[in-house]
Structures are given as C-alpha cells and as structure tokens.
Amino acid sequence: MTKTDKKSFNQSLAEWKLFIYNRTTGEFLGRTAKSWGLILLFYLVFYGFLAALFSFTMWAMLQTLNDEVPKYRDQIPSPGLMVFPKPVSALDFSFSLSDAESYQGYIDDLKKFLKPYGLEEQKNLTDCTNGTFFEQKGPEYTACQFPLALLEACSGVDDPTFGYQEGKPCILVKMNRIIGLKPQGEPRIECTGKSESTAFLSTYPSNGTIDLKYFPYYGKKLHGNYLQPLVAVQVGFGSDADVREVMVECKIDGSPNLKTQNDRDKFLGRVAFKITMHA
C-alpha cells in the first residue's frame, strides 16, 4: 500500500467521523438536534393520528355489534345436520363385531357427548311444556330438559355399548343451532337407508320428532346451558354376510321454513353417512 493510498483512507475515515458527529456545527448524522427533534415530532404526530383514526373507526364499528346476537344472520337460511360419534374417516363408520376395540372409540365418544344430558347435569333445567315454543324475555335464560329416555335403546342407560356389541349401532343426529329460529309445523329428522343387504332403521324419539319447546335458541352467551334436541338412529342388519353395510341419509322434514334443497349447498338440512360392519 502506497503513502497516497493511506492518505486517501485516512481522509475517508475522517469524513465519516465528521458525518457522524460534527463538533463545529453540532450535527449528528448530518442534522442538528433541532432538525432531529422536528422530524421525530412530525412522525410522532403523523403515526399518532393514524393510530387514533384506526381506534376511532374500530370503536365506531363495535358500537354497531351486539355481544349477544350476531348482526348478520340472513346468510344461514336453514340449519345443517351433524352426526355423533365422530367417524374415523369422513362420515364412514366401520367396525368389526368380533373386535371390541374397533368400536370402543365410538362408545367413548357417545358417552362424552351425552354427559351433559345426564340427570344430575339437568336438575336445574326447566321441564317445559311439549308442543310450544319456550320463549323468554330475560335477563335470565334457562333451557328445557332433554330426558335421555327419549333415545330409548340408544340412550346408553340400558345398553352402555349403544348397540355396537350386538351389531345394532346407534348414531345420534342433531341440528345446528341458529339463534332465534322458530320452525314451523312439526319438525322431525327423517332417515332412510340404502343398501344391497337387508337393513332396517329404528328412530328415537318415535318418528324422529323434534319438539318445539327447544326453540328458540338465544345464543351461547345468554343460553349457555342450552341442550340441543337429539334424534337417534339405530341400524339393524338382517343378513349374516361377513361384511354388511348401509348408506343412511337423514334430512329435516315436516317444517316448511327449514329447507333441504339449495342449488349452492346440496347438504343443506341433510347429512349422509355409511355404516360398515364386519363379522
């Protein structure tokens, strides 16, 4: 390295030091303290204004919302259906009659799901009048009792295996909750089976009836102890084949304002599941 190169490097270093802090002008990174102060003040005011504007718009929007009832409910014209226990694969229940472990998971899932429906858990609920809406004005809201006895052979009371041990599996069907829904007519869940082998269905309560006393629903916050009405479907097979299966479709029926036909949603108000039982 030549003497000229060393001088050029020293000059560059001196210029950098001068840029970082100039003792003569008192500048730091090319600006005086006053200049830095004005810039910081500008950004403080600018971003403070943006934060205040965002907070105000959020506050104004929240004033239009109700903590207890959703503002927009017209996008859900009719409830869908769900089934329990939860199948291992999508809506396909498969088990072996000779292997208790293959259906033990279904039994455990049903017991867990029905736990809130026990006598002790329902002792503080209301014994409502059948056939009429249970409308309440608050501020306290209670729920109607749903006796497990309505599910008869699928209640788990007399048969803790819910029919699986005997080859007559039970599936529970329920409607999704919709706040303020008041079904017209006599709503029920109708289930039909389609299979190559002989299979028959038993529905509990009789005819899959859903009593009007379980409506309307007032929302999770107000109606926290609400129990959804259930319909149980028990499948029996008439053949002795090694593999017996049936395709079951359940849909809402008997209520004009609960739809089961929709071009955009082919599963609106209905659900289909398959049961396969191996020997």
From Swiss-Prot:
GO molecular function: ATPase activator activity; ATPase binding; protein-macromolecule adaptor activity; transporter activator activity
Record topology, Cytoplasmic segments: 1-35
Predominant cellular place of this UniProt entry's protein: membrane
A GO cellular component entry from the record: melanosome
InterPro entries per UniProt: Na/K_ATPase_sub_beta, Na/K_ATPase_sub_beta_sf
Self-association state and partner proteins as the record states: The sodium/potassium-transporting ATPase is composed of a catalytic alpha subunit, an auxiliary non-catalytic beta subunit and an additional regulatory subunit. Interacts with catalytic alpha subunit ATP12A.
Function: This is the non-catalytic component of the active enzyme, which catalyzes the hydrolysis of ATP coupled with the exchange of Na(+) and K(+) ions across the plasma membrane. The exact function of the beta-3 subunit is not known.
Name of the featured protein: Sodium/potassium-transporting ATPase subunit beta-3
Source species: Bos taurus (Bovine)
Taxonomy of the source species: Eukaryota, Metazoa, Chordata, Craniata, Vertebrata
Gene this protein is translated from: ATP1B3
